[in-house]
């Protein structure tokens, strides 16, 4: 498939953009995480996910509809088999509260 057949026209892009609500949100790190690595590593993830669920419910209740998170490469590097599952659970939790997620990829220089 060529790039031109899948590329949106400017009109289609504006129609999509104008049909979306205004983004209201924040850069997100759970209150029980000391840094971005702690948010994603397997250690204590279940506890962090409970906190995330509670905090995203609160965020939605005050009108937030979007958050930005940073995925840290060192966690993926060390836990590459289990990390995608944790990330998916995070996305499902955000979606449950009507919150979209802007993902930023960290690298090994951001530690």
What are the language-model segments listed below?
Residues 2-111:
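Active-site mouth of glycoside hydrolases
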